[in-house]
Amino acid sequence: MTHSQTEAPQHRGSRQGRKFDDRERQILELQLRDLSDGNVGRITPHGPLFARPPRSLQAERSTYVSTLSGRDKVIMAGIAALWAVAFSWFWLWWLQPGHLVSWVGMGVTSVLLLYLSTQACYFLIAVARLPRVRPSLKIPRLRLAIAVTRAPSEPWAMARRTLEAMKAQEFPYAYDVWLCDEDPSPEIYEWCAAQGIRVSTRKGVPEYNRSSWPRRTKCKEGNLAYFYDHWGYSQYDVVVQLDCDHEPSSTYLAEVVRPFSDEAIGYVAAPSICDANARTSWAARGRLYREAPFHGPFQLGHANRLAPVCIGSHYGVRTRALRDIGGLGPDLAEDFTTTFLFNSAGWQGAFAIDAEAHGLGPMTFADMVTQEYQWSRSLVAMMFGMIPRHMHRLPVRLRIRFTIVLIYYPLLALAAIAGLVLPAAASISGNIWVSVNYLAFLGNFFAMGLCMLFLLLLLRRRGLLRPHSAPVLSWELWLFTLARWPWVAWGVLGAIVQETFRRPIYFKVTPKDRSGSEVLPKRLVLPYGGIVTALSVAAVVGEMTGPAVGYVFLCILGACAYAVVGIAVSVLHVLEAAKAAGTRLRSAMITARTPLLLALAPLLPLALAIYVFPSYLFAVLGW
């Protein structure tokens, strides 16, 4: 058989495959166009494109009231003014001509400091508003359902507790409870029937197990799409969704449904409080404390025209609005894409700060890494797909708002990398980029941070953090912040590779229970060991060859910090594994023995850098 003969059948097969894909896409497009009453013009793998201009909807003024008292507003304005003074003073001091050594060094360092110092701006703008839904607003009487999703890897006992809490809501009107289960067992069917809970499953339905959006397999979007297409749109005005592990408080449903009395509101976001396992997981506590201001005052500040973001699958939707956008958005971050599509279509969002559902945070550090990687990859991937096709539909304020969200992860990764590379490069080269007094630098820079600390303490005192008791400062918060960024950077890189080479992406559901036998993969400690080694070597080279004392000190300081991170991650894994398994520390050591050795190995070059530094300092300063 000749080469041309072997090629011909493959070519015909590929053409037939493309015809099938095109035919399937056309059918789906017609279905979503019909569902949205013509608003979905066409669909792409990245999401829908709308045919009609956005709706002109605005919430009624009577829907919202201010959260803060007049006195608190004055105090917050005073703190904001102090921050502005500290910010201005820092930059006036920093840009003094006497600090300039090289334009390149000053420019690069200034860009990094500008990013770090302006992060507080957006937070200050958001918390200056804090409009909350009026508590006296009457709960509307609607056809209502509350639904929870469950994957096969999620324990039935956990889902059952959530369903029981859903049934026990203090709500003035009738509502239905649904379980959207990927693979319900006979036991689940029997229990749900006895409790009056309805079950939806797409198991064995190929049309709802597609490889890409819409109705994607192994994804909450596809699971919920089956429910909405068969019952949600036709039988209910509002549907409230929950993650399997998030057990709602008794007033959860009332708080989420209340804003829907305003016809302009298409969705209601709620706080994502992942503290159910906070006592047994430092990673869960770290994320919980890091995100407490976000899930409270920051989200609340975006209510009423600034698009609060749905986080997790716990939010409420007006089914008419969801039909309007063609259903839930694509990707792992369906919460964010759905929020974005609602706003692209012109619907308003509210934030129910008092709707509390307590769920699970990451069980282990490995789970935390998986989540950080997947979330950053998903959010960055949107910059290449759906987002640019809708941005022109948004008002300027929302374009700025969503742009800030989308660039958060890339800027976080770049800033962290730059913060490590700059002192190392200066130390090795011996080039002093700027000439400043370091104590003066620390004092002027951290004056801005002190203002933000006062603000967070005020917000915590007013009960606005979620959870209320989250500390403003803690060692878990510090460790989480330092440990997460390498995986965020890896997720950003993964998104770029994924979109450049059109590689398929797969999602991993993190475990919802722990046996204590989980092994800490050594690859999760390697980045910190690499950072410690690189900074220590840079410090030693600088001590042997150059006069850049300040940068050598920064290298040693950074190496010490990441040495603590690597060791702490390993030791804490052993401690938590022993507690979960009910064994002795010696027995649990096997779960992190190799990572601990990898974390300890870089202490040798670090010890050398620390040992040499005093004599190096005296020699350079001529003491």
Language model features with spans:
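Cell-envelope/extracellular polymer assembly enzymes that use nucleotide-activated donors
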Residues: 143-147, 176, 337
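Membrane-embedded multi-pass helical conduit in multi-pass membrane proteins
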Residues: 87-114, 126-129, 135-139, 408-501, ...
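N-proximal low-complexity "stem/linker" segments adjacent to membrane-targeting elements
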Residues: 49-164
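Long helical/loop segments within the catalytic core of UDP-sugar-dependent glycosyltransferases
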Residues: 201-236, 250-333, 343-344, 361, ...
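A conserved acidic beta->alpha catalytic loop
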Residues: 181-189, 204-206
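Catalytic donor-sugar/metal-binding loop of nucleotide-sugar-dependent glycosyltransferases
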Residues: 330, 339-357
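The conserved acidic donor/metal-binding loop of glycosyltransferases
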Residues: 242-247
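Short, acidic, metal-binding catalytic loop of nucleotide-sugar glycosyltransferases
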Residues: 162-174
